[in-house]
């Protein structure tokens, strides 16, 4: 199995653009497979940004302790001061409910909460226009869906798009796969003609490389810096990436993530 570690660099550029929830991409390239997260953490966003294709893992069991329906907001000037932004969720099939079938318990109330809390936390940022663009695009989704996965998916795509990402987004529920955990991930990569699989630190703990090796698909290990003085990375595993966007804006944040992605690709494709 091919293993590459990705670290952060600081000297790259990337363009920003207005949020757009529709994406199309060409076959091949690097894929990341991850559950939909509400306003994801920077560590998650960085992994998805580094991939050319995000396969949304929407047909696994919903977990209330995970991030599908909640995000941890950090105060603009004091990231240690945090608050959960949570979407009350109804599980029609109890604990066995899949992420794709989880529903908003009160869509109107959730929409108001999202709007008020994000404005409260980041409305004073000089980069508020960029944050507001992300927020407005997500608020619009409450008018079209009551599915938690739909809101979480939209929040992630909108953040990625604000940073200039223009990859492909697919749902795992539309792709037939085998039952085994690693077999399933490998089948998703094969079915989408992906040439490499980008695996985060969480997935690496259980991943069996054999199903990927059988198809000649290298696995790239992705992680963000741990021993660093940069507050953006020190807080990247715990709080929503909205804080980073509010701190440095879309252009600088995109450049930072692009540098990390480029270093990964240079190491992984040699």
Labelled PLM ranges:
Residues 2-270:
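Residues lining hydrophobic/aromatic ligand-binding pockets adjacent to catalytic sites
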């Amino acid at each position: 199995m091919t293993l590459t570690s990705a670290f952060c660099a600081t000297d790259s550029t990337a363009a920003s653009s207005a949020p757009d929830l529709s994406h199309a991409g060409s076959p091949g390239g690097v894929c990341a497979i991850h559950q939909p997260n509400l306003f994801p953490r920077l560590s998650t966003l960085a992994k998805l940004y580094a991939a050319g294709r995000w396969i949304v893992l929407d047909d696994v069991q919903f977990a209330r302790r995970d991030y599908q329906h909640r995000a941890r907001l950090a105060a603009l000037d004091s990231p240690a001061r945090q608050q959960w932004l949570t979407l009350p969720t109804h599980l029609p099939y109890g604990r066995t409910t899949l992420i794709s079938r989880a529903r908003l318990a009160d869509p109107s109330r959730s929409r108001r909460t999202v709007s008020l809390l994000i404005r409260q936390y980041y409305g004073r940022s000089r980069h508020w226009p960029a944050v507001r663009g992300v927020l407005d695009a997500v608020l619009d989704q409450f008018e079209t869906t009551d599915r938690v996965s739909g809101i979480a998916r939209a929040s992630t795509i909108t953040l990625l798009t604000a940073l200039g990402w223009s990859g492909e987004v697919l749902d795992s529920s539309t792709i037939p796969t085998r039952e085994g955990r690693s077999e399933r991930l490998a089948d998703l990569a094969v079915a989408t003609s992906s040439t490499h699989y980008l695996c985060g630190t969480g997935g690496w703990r259980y991943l069996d490389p054999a199903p990927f090796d059988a198809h000649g698909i290298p696995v790239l290990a992705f992680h963000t810096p741990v021993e660093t003085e940069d507050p953006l990375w020190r807080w990247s595993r715990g709080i929503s990436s909205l804080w980073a966007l509010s701190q440095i804006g879309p252009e600088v944040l995109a450049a930072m993530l692009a540098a990390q992605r480029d270093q990964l690709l240079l190491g992984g494709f040699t």
